[in-house]
């Protein structure tokens, strides 16, 4: 009898202190069950490319065999259904280079601890008199999660094994609850945290080249949109800007609605006010009337990315404005930064190499 009470106590204790984890587990399993039930499954029990949203299949196809099983579907739901947190752990499904470290700082703005991941090349510990370039990487998706695209550090590490490429410090950023925006509505200020807190923190703590010539900015999807906005808002902070997979259709919609983001792909029908003129189209146009330095820009996209046509339209828009930039396209790649890095990460890394300063 006493044993039963002990078991009951353990059960109550577990539910009380781990109810969020339990609900998350139940939600994921329900998502897998009903998701697989709703979608067409072939006779072998797999999802195929034509059964999923165009331009995004590789996000589910973790092993690259052009089929998605329940385990892969479960991992996808788990990754993109996490509650927002200012500190996140790496996905234990993957192996990361030992040069990738977890960092954190106390945010005055948010009155909390904010995490980041930082890749520190071996040369940093070997060349103690040298200062190093930095590249800030802004993740895709919402809400913010500094661990989401930290797997890219594997590709970066392999590329830096080439002694002809000057290594850099890469910082993987948490963009806040409304990724990379300031939001009074959500009490989340990802933009201000990056610009006013994280960058100064990194420059104080590490031997960085503390000027725009030695500081790069890169992002994908939501992060790709953000880095394009930031290059025009803070041109004196960054020397190079690499924008991948961004939805410039949504940026255009924000422009046309005078600051409201109403993403038609959002099933929750959330509408956020992000600021009139706070979009990649308006900011680029305003920049042409200024005398400000223009960072070196590269737009990049997979040809099969669902955002490709919008990126191409933005590319032509920049050409009309006279804003010089590169447009790097890869065939057989969809909306997946890992796949892009796997195929041609070297081009992305080399883009940020130090060059003599020049601008419009």
Give a label for each model feature.
Residues 4-18:
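Hydrophobic membrane-insertion alpha-helices, especially the h-region
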Residues 14-30:
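Membrane-interface motif at the C-terminal end of an N-terminal transmembrane signal
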Residues 24, 73, 78-360:
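Non-catalytic cap/lid and distal C-terminal segments of serine-dependent acyl enzymes
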Residues 30-42, 53-64:
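Primarily EF-hand calcium-binding motifs
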Residues 45-49, 66-70, 132:
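Glycine-aliphatic tripeptides that mark coil-to-beta-strand junctions in extracellular
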Residues 48-58, 70-81:
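Amphipathic regulatory helices of Ca2+-sensor modules
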């Amino acid at each position: 009898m006493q044993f039963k009470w002990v078991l009951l106590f353990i059960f109550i204790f577990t539910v009380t202190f781990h109810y969020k984890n339990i609900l998350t587990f139940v939600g994921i399993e329900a998502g897998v069950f009903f998701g697989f039930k709703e979608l067409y499954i072939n006779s072998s029990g797999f999802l195929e490319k034509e059964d999923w949203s165009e331009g995004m299949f590789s996000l589910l196809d973790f092993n690259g065999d052009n089929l998605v099983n329940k385990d892969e579907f479960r991992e996808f739901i788990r990754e993109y259904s996490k509650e927002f947190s200012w500190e996140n752990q790496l996905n234990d499904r993957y192996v990361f280079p030992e040069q990738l470290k977890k960092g954190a700082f106390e945010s005055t703005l948010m009155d909390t601890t904010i995490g980041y991941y930082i890749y520190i090349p071996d040369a940093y510990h070997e060349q103690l008199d040298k200062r190093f370039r930095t590249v800030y990487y802004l993740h895709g998706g919402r809400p913010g999660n500094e661990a989401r695209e930290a797997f890219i550090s594997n590709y970066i590490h392999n590329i830096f094994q080439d002694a002809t490429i000057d290594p850099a410090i890469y910082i993987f950023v948490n963009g806040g609850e409304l990724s990379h925006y300031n939001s009074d509505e959500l009490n989340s200020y990802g933009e201000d945290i990056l610009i006013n807190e994280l960058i100064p923190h990194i420059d104080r703590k590490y031997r960085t080249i503390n000027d725009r010539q030695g500081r790069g900015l890169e992002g994908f999807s939501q992060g790709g949109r953000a880095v394009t906005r930031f290059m025009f808002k803070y041109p004196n902070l960054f020397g190079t800007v690499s924008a991948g997979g961004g939805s410039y259709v949504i940026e255009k919609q924000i422009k046309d609605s005078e600051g409201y983001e109403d993403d038609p792909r959002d099933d929750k029908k959330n509408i956020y006010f992000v600021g009139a003129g706070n979009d990649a189209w308006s900011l680029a146009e305003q920049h042409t009337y200024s005398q400000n330095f223009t960072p070196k820009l590269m737009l990049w996209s997979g040809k099969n990315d669902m955002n490709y046509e919008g990126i191409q339209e933005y590319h032509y828009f920049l050409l009309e404005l006279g804003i010089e930039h590169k447009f790097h396209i890869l065939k057989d790649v969809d909306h997946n930064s890992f796949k892009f890095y796997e195929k041609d990460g070297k081009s992305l890394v080399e883009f940020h190499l130090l060059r003599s300063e020049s601008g419009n």
